[in-house]
């Protein structure tokens, strides 16, 4: 029974739960790695060992957080749980493929962990640039294991993307147009399209790297007519859409949370929100070289990538102001989920502004590979994606479990986390402006103060993580069941009660559309 339910599952709710548990576990691993980084940088001098081991930790931290925490939780966890419920589908379009998508992830994670334990580990950074990732600078199996790990995670995501696209387009009630589906469903659809287009390019790039390392090809080796810059183009053509893949489902969740706790029946500017997400998805594919301003591109190329990157700020601004307009005049309920959503809007905007700074190719020459970049992307990830995940979790936890979290603890948890992440990453802007480079395990004494403060902030965030584990335990131990749910047209996932029955929408849904 246990094996049939949890290993051979074809139920979108159970698979969503598996994704959430896996992502939570990976999140703990990623947090542990990040604390190793901040412990090393807490004061000048060496703590862990040489720079190779430090870079292995940095690389693993990035891969774990991106491929095994944010994507499984947002797309696999919330996506699987909510999309079928929101469109009235009995399950996903391909339930067994759904199960395979999940079970490809633990072996992938295993390969990544193995890569850090054989030879010297993969100390390449998550970008895995050759020649550093070649078989000279990284002899041994480490980088090959990392590449195989990425292959598995990529296949998992591609299959998941096919599944979500088919489900969302094909399994709605016949009377329901695509423009009547909730914004979270839209965000997952657009994310899935991005995955489907971006991941094959990454697969091509890392497969060429694999053959360069093992079969004497020279795709990225100038000695044989190759070019390492080709790898950078291939990687970032995936890498930039990837960062939008990480944030778009968060946009969808924030739209639902803000609408719900503002007492509104619909978000402000629904069509504007949809088109903004589609614009972001499209523009995300034509700005990749802004990661490469320092490799010596033509001035006209740099001008194009600078302006194209800045244009992404427009649809993003549409979303931010639509969230604010949704709040406007609402009967705002200061629930923990709403606090996460408001924190998201503020901090994501701050991260977006530093992104506009970095979009300037001339400024980026100075700021590239400094802590300014680290601060920028941790504001949009550690305070964008993670805040959206936390907000979505405390909002939908009663739906998933049938129990309610302690609201006071949840607000305290938000406060600790808010202080922790800001204390960690705000000082890094100053470090970057003073020229402290990324990916070094040591630094001149002049940078000590801000690094010490940053490392203290990371340990505050750690207490927040531990408090969250306690909150979840407390909710299951206290068993406060959900009594009533306020239903509107925009939150139909609550229709079947908390938690919903194992099978929902077993017969086709009748939709009466105005």
Curated annotation (Swiss-Prot):
<feature type="topological domain" description="Mitochondrial matrix">
    <location>
        <begin position="1"/>
        <end position="11"/>
    </location>
</feature>
<feature type="topological domain" description="Mitochondrial intermembrane">
    <location>
        <begin position="118"/>
        <end position="140"/>
    </location>
</feature>
<keyword id="KW-0408">Iron</keyword>
<feature type="binding site">
    <location>
        <position position="40"/>
    </location>
    <ligand>
        <name>Na(+)</name>
    </ligand>
</feature>
<feature type="transmembrane region" description="Helical; Name=VI">
    <location>
        <begin position="228"/>
        <end position="261"/>
    </location>
</feature>
<feature type="topological domain" description="Mitochondrial matrix">
    <location>
        <begin position="328"/>
        <end position="335"/>
    </location>
</feature>
<feature type="cross-link" description="1'-histidyl-3'-tyrosine (His-Tyr)">
    <location>
        <begin position="240"/>
        <end position="244"/>
    </location>
</feature>
<dbReference type="GO" id="GO:0046872">
    <property type="term" value="F:metal ion binding"/>
</dbReference>
<feature type="transmembrane region" description="Helical; Name=III">
    <location>
        <begin position="95"/>
        <end position="117"/>
    </location>
</feature>
<keyword id="KW-0249">Electron transport</keyword>
<dbReference type="InterPro" id="IPR000883">
    <property type="entry name" value="Cyt_C_Oxase_1"/>
</dbReference>
<comment type="subunit">
    <text>Component of the cytochrome c oxidase (complex IV, CIV), a multisubunit enzyme composed of 14 subunits. The complex is composed of a catalytic core of 3 subunits MT-CO1, MT-CO2 and MT-CO3, encoded in the mitochondrial DNA, and 11 supernumerary subunits COX4I, COX5A, COX5B, COX6A, COX6B, COX6C, COX7A, COX7B, COX7C, COX8 and NDUFA4, which are encoded in the nuclear genome.</text>
</comment>
<feature type="binding site" description="axial binding residue">
    <location>
        <position position="61"/>
    </location>
    <ligand>
        <name>Fe(II)-heme a</name>
    </ligand>
</feature>
<keyword id="KW-0472">Membrane</keyword>
<feature type="transmembrane region" description="Helical; Name=II">
    <location>
        <begin position="51"/>
        <end position="86"/>
    </location>
</feature>
<feature type="topological domain" description="Mitochondrial intermembrane">
    <location>
        <begin position="287"/>
        <end position="298"/>
    </location>
</feature>
<dbReference type="InterPro" id="IPR023615">
    <property type="entry name" value="Cyt_c_Oxase_su1_BS"/>
</dbReference>
<feature type="topological domain" description="Mitochondrial matrix">
    <location>
        <begin position="87"/>
        <end position="94"/>
    </location>
</feature>
<feature type="binding site">
    <location>
        <position position="45"/>
    </location>
    <ligand>
        <name>Na(+)</name>
    </ligand>
</feature>
<protein>
    <recommendedName>
        <fullName>Cytochrome c oxidase subunit 1</fullName>
        <ecNumber>7.1.1.9</ecNumber>
    </recommendedName>
</protein>
<dbReference type="GO" id="GO:0015990">
    <property type="term" value="P:electron transport coupled proton transport"/>
</dbReference>
<dbReference type="GO" id="GO:0004129">
    <property type="term" value="F:cytochrome-c oxidase activity"/>
</dbReference>
<feature type="topological domain" description="Mitochondrial intermembrane">
    <location>
        <begin position="358"/>
        <end position="370"/>
    </location>
</feature>
<dbReference type="InterPro" id="IPR033944">
    <property type="entry name" value="Cyt_c_oxase_su1_dom"/>
</dbReference>
<feature type="topological domain" description="Mitochondrial intermembrane">
    <location>
        <begin position="213"/>
        <end position="227"/>
    </location>
</feature>
<feature type="binding site">
    <location>
        <position position="369"/>
    </location>
    <ligand>
        <name>Mg(2+)</name>
    </ligand>
</feature>
<comment type="function">
    <text>Component of the cytochrome c oxidase, the last enzyme in the mitochondrial electron transport chain which drives oxidative phosphorylation. The respiratory chain contains 3 multisubunit complexes succinate dehydrogenase (complex II, CII), ubiquinol-cytochrome c oxidoreductase (cytochrome b-c1 complex, complex III, CIII) and cytochrome c oxidase (complex IV, CIV), that cooperate to transfer electrons derived from NADH and succinate to molecular oxygen, creating an electrochemical gradient over the inner membrane that drives transmembrane transport and the ATP synthase.</text>
</comment>
<keyword id="KW-0186">Copper</keyword>
<keyword id="KW-0813">Transport</keyword>
<feature type="transmembrane region" description="Helical; Name=XI">
    <location>
        <begin position="407"/>
        <end position="433"/>
    </location>
</feature>
<feature type="binding site">
    <location>
        <position position="368"/>
    </location>
    <ligand>
        <name>Mg(2+)</name>
    </ligand>
</feature>
<keyword id="KW-0460">Magnesium</keyword>
<keyword id="KW-0349">Heme</keyword>
<dbReference type="InterPro" id="IPR023616">
    <property type="entry name" value="Cyt_c_oxase-like_su1_dom"/>
</dbReference>
<dbReference type="GO" id="GO:0020037">
    <property type="term" value="F:heme binding"/>
</dbReference>
<feature type="binding site">
    <location>
        <position position="240"/>
    </location>
    <ligand>
        <name>Cu cation</name>
    </ligand>
</feature>
<feature type="binding site">
    <location>
        <position position="290"/>
    </location>
    <ligand>
        <name>Cu cation</name>
    </ligand>
</feature>
<keyword id="KW-0496">Mitochondrion</keyword>
<feature type="binding site">
    <location>
        <position position="291"/>
    </location>
    <ligand>
        <name>Cu cation</name>
    </ligand>
</feature>
<feature type="topological domain" description="Mitochondrial matrix">
    <location>
        <begin position="171"/>
        <end position="182"/>
    </location>
</feature>
<keyword id="KW-1278">Translocase</keyword>
<feature type="transmembrane region" description="Helical; Name=I">
    <location>
        <begin position="12"/>
        <end position="40"/>
    </location>
</feature>
